[in-house]
Structure formats: C-alpha cells, structure tokens
C-alpha cells in the first residue's frame, strides 16, 4: 500500500497536472494555485516518508535497559534544544526542496503547454530553446 502512495506522489509531482491548464484567469498565470498544489503534494509526500521512518525507528530501537549509548543519544542529552532545532531545520529544508522542485516541474510543463498553444509566456526564448527557470524567476520578482 505504501508503494502505491509513493508511486502516486511521484506521478503528481513530476508529471503535468491537467487541471492547471484551466487555471488561466484573464490570460495570466496564477502562481498561487501552483504553490498551493506544490504544498499539498509535499505534505502528502512528507507524511508517507515520516510514516516509513517512524516504522523503521520502532523496529530498530534498542531496548531501554541497554548500556550502549550512541553519539546521537549523547548529543540529545547534552543539548536537547539544539537537537530539536536541528531536526526541525532538516525537516523544513527538505520540505522547501520538495515544494520548490514540484513547483518548478509544474511550471515548466505549464509554460510548455502555453507556448505550444501560441500563448506567449514571459521568460521563454525561441520555440526550440525555452528557458523555464527564467519564467519562475520572473514570476517570483513580479
């Protein structure tokens, strides 16, 4: 079942999502819809990933009465605030990476579709030599 969730998440992340073709309001690209979609897919992917990590943690957890202490355990004992901050920082950076990569993929497919229909998308060059990253940069600064 988990494999099906991961396959669907990858399908929705790295393949064009057809409802975005209908989201042109007044011939302008609505970036908020792309961001919302990317956030939802990233949350979904993170939930599947966390569930697997939690299951592995429980299976690999040492019994409580053991005398063995690893470096991670020692770090958590010495500075618990830094340990929590570091974990949340990893979580946040990975989440931002997932959201940004999803956003780039969806915008690239969307701008390619718009160019094939003859609609001019800012940041694209000749039809054979399109630069999709510049579309995202222009939209972010716009």
Swiss-Prot record:
Membrane topology: Multi-pass membrane protein
Intracellular or extracellular location(s): Membrane
Domain of life: Eukaryota
Keywords, comma-separated and alphabetical: Membrane, Transmembrane, Transmembrane helix
One family name in Pfam for this protein: DUF4668
Chain ranges passing through the membrane: 3-23, 30-50, 91-111
Main location: membrane
Any single Gene Ontology cellular-component annotation: membrane
Protein name: Uncharacterized protein YIL029C
Organism of provenance: Saccharomyces cerevisiae (strain ATCC 204508 / S288c) (Baker's yeast)
């Amino acid at each position: 079942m988990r494999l099906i969730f991961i396959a669907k998440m990858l399908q929705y992340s790295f393949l064009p999502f057809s409802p975005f073709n209908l989201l042109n309001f007044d011939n302008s690209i609505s970036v908020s819809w792309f961001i919302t979609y990317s956030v939802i897919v990233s949350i979904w992917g993170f939930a599947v990933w966390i569930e697997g990590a939690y299951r592995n943690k429980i299976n690999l957890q040492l019994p409580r009465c053991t005398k063995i202490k690893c470096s991670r355990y020692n770090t958590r004992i010495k500075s618990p605030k830094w340990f929590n901050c570091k974990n949340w920082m990893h979580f946040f950076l990975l989440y931002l990476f997932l959201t940004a990569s999803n956003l780039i993929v969806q915008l690239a497919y969307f701008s390619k579709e718009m160019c094939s229909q003859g609609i001019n998308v800012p940041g694209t060059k000749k039809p054979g030599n399109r630069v999709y990253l510049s579309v995202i940069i222009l939209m972010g600064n716009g």
